[in-house]
């Protein structure tokens, strides 16, 4: 199965829209338990210049994703496409047309909350649990930083050097060291009389706390000495206001003997209120999707954001996604200060028009297939050419002369690496056979990308216990006496597995376009499956109007045609809802695998809602028209708990 779906763990809509009185804004409202998520912009409703906005936040559990990747259920970074999927929620209000939504990573921790009211905005957090337009959470703390002054610091080396402190309101102050005086006003740190680090650190504290800097909302407090009066000194500096806006940067790289302790950035641990009203978002990666009718679902590739969350060394913190209208479609508002007001966002590129209202189903919806999901799409198709081994031909492209052979090392029903090591060297040899056992000496074949004949080739480890080789073989490897090949696998000079004999085929061109039609069935499909199962389902196919000869008539198993390029989709029978579409684009996540027994697929039944009947449809690629042709068959089964 090449799809994994992760449902949201948190979601909430935040807004600065007016309540029904068109006077009070709902900036303190929370909608964390509502079953829909809402985005809109209302222009000039309360006044000729008023703007009302709605945005939403949504988070997915990367801890579970990391667990799946470690277990090998999810492929490595670079092999997975991550899609954020949100489903349109019909409603009785107007729907905007022709607009763009943007998705970006939220850059601060937020709380979901328990609000429900999306009309009157009456479910206020009152600075309690839950995010809203103003607050990310209720952990109201002020940011702090600790300066470390090196023991025995030379004040002469520090003279003339500067650093800048910025408070949560954005007010900045430059502080400059000076050994010519003892002034501690207006940002001067006068050290003329200082004789040791105790004196210097106290002077820094006095300069920061001086009343001449009344607009700087920062205070220096506790001093801690490592030893005597000239030892290392630490000074705790705090923002006076709580909130994320206090987490401002400090650069001490240009100051001798002075450094940050316990931080490389600056102020940290400020929490509670957003740094910017309406939420804090990372601007380095922004994804957009255009909507035409306004009734579309959202499906957007967020792979680079998710993979940054999953980085092993220095991951981004996962605070989820923020979804909103782009600046162009959010309402126009020009603040007299050029900054956001207490409730409205300064946006001079915005629209002087309304876009009301786009809704998506939230994580609390009762509709199983409308829940927001973070979908991992990847191609884990296995194409084992044992039953479709082609002998090399000069009329075939190099890629089509290659044949892929797999080895699966199952131990007590579970895949295990050979010798228990992911670095174990496994090799393959091919032998002629007149029946089912290897005969004679190993035959010569060629590896992928090589013109040199070999008799032994080291395999590639694809994943735990799964190995493969890509080879091409000339027609001389078989004969009328020995028409079959047998693969023998070796580790540490010991043969440990002999495969079943298979008969290579010679390429034969057609004189005209091949108009093939097929008969298909699913040979092991049961009527019911539990929703905690993953089932391997076999697909049998043969050409329609196939005429068996005396051999195939006498054979107990009918000839099984290997479909080299086929895909499947899933429908819910009750309403024909497509719950899994064909994956025939750049990521072929629903492509059929095949091995010596024919085609198959693996389906994780937890993707499906119990209590319903579902049906498979299949599509086979037609090389002549270069399109997938859906077959006229529907194979039904039911999922139960």
Regions found by a protein language model. Give the residues of each.
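Secreted, disulfide-rich extracellular signaling modules
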Residues: 1-144, 253, 261-480, 511, ...
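A short beta-turn/strand-edge loop motif at beta-sheet boundaries
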Residues: 74, 92-95, 154-157, 368, ...
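Extended, beta-strand-rich, solvent-exposed assembly scaffolds of outer structural proteins
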Residues: 142-252
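A beta-strand/beta-hairpin structural motif
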Residues: 297-304, 460-474, 581-609
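Internal, hydrophobic beta-strand segments that form the core of beta-sheet-rich folds
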Residues: 320-328, 480-493, 565-566, 600-602, ...
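Short beta-strand elements
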Residues: 366-368, 491-529, 622-641
């Amino acid at each position: 199965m090449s799809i994994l779906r992760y449902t949201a763990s948190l979601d909430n809509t935040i807004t600065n829209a007016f309540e029904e009185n068109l006077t009070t804004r709902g900036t303190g409202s929370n909608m964390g338990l509502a079953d829909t998520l809402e985005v809109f912009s209302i222009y000039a409703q309360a006044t000729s210049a008023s703007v009302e906005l709605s945005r939403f936040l949504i988070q997915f559990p990367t801890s579970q994703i990391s667990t799946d990747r470690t277990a090998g259920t999810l492929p490595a970074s670079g092999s997975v496409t991550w899609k954020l999927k949100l489903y349109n929620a019909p409603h009785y209000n107007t729907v905007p047309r022709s607009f763009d939504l943007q998705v970006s990573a939220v850059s601060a921790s937020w709380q979901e909350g328990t609000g429900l009211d999306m009309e009157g905005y009456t479910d206020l957090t009152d600075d309690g649990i839950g995010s809203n337009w103003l607050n990310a959470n209720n952990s109201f703390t002020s940011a702090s930083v600790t300066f470390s002054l090196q023991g025995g610091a030379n004040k002469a080396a520090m003279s003339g050097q500067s650093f800048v402190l910025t408070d949560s309101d954005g007010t900045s102050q430059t502080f400059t060291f000076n050994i010519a005086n003892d002034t501690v006003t207006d940002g001067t740190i006068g050290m003329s009389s200082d004789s040791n680090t105790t004196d210097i650190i106290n002077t820094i504290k006095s300069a920061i706390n001086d009343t001449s800097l009344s607009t700087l909302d920062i205070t220096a407090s506790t001093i801690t000495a490592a030893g005597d009066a000239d030892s290392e000194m630490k000074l705790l500096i705090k923002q006076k206001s709580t909130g994320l806006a206090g987490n401002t940067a400090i650069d001490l790289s240009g100051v001798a003997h002075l450094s940050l302790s316990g931080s490389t950035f600056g102020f940290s641990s400020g929490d509670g209120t957003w740094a910017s009203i309406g939420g804090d978002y990372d601007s380095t990666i922004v994804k957009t999707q255009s909507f035409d009718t306004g009734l579309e679902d959202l499906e957007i590739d967020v792979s680079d954001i998710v993979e940054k969350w999953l980085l092993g060394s220095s991951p981004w913190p996962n605070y989820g996604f923020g979804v909103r209208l782009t600046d162009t479609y959010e309402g126009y508002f020009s603040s007299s200060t050029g900054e956001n007001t207490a409730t409205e966002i300064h946006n001079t590129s915005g629209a002087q028009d309304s876009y009301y209202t786009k809704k998506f189903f939230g994580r609390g919806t009762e509709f199983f297939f409308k829940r927001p999901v973070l979908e991992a799409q990847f191609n884990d198709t296995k194409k084992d050419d044992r039953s479709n081994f082609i002998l090399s031909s000069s009329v075939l492209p190099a890629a089509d002369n290659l044949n892929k052979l797999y080895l699966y090392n199952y131990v007590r029903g579970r895949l295990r690496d050979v010798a228990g090591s992911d670095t174990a060297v496994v090799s393959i040899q091919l032998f002629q056979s007149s029946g089912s056992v290897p005969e004679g000496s190993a035959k010569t074949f060629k590896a992928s990308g090589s013109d040199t004949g070999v008799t032994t080739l080291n395999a590639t480890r694809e994943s735990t216990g799964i190995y493969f080789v890509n080879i091409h073989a000339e027609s001389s490897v078989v004969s009328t006496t020995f028409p079959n090949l047998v693969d023998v696998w070796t580790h540490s000079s010991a043969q440990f597995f002999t495969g079943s004999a298979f008969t290579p085929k010679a390429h034969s061109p057609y004189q005209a376009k091949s108009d093939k039609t097929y008969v298909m069935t699913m040979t092991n499909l049961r009527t019911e499956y539990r929703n905690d199962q993953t089932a391997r389902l076999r697909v049998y196919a043969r050409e329609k109007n196939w005429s068996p000869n005396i051999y195939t008539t006498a054979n107990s198993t009918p000839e099984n045609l290997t479909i080299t390029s086929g895909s499947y989709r899933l429908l819910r029978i009750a309403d024909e809802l497509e719950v899994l579409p064909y994956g025939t684009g750049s990521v072929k996540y629903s492509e059929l695998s095949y091995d010596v027994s024919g085609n198959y697929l693996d389906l994780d039944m937890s993707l499906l809602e119990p209590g319903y009947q579902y049906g498979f449809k299949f599509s086979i690629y037609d090389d002549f028209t270069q399109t997938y042709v859906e077959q006229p068959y529907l194979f039904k089964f039911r999922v139960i708990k």
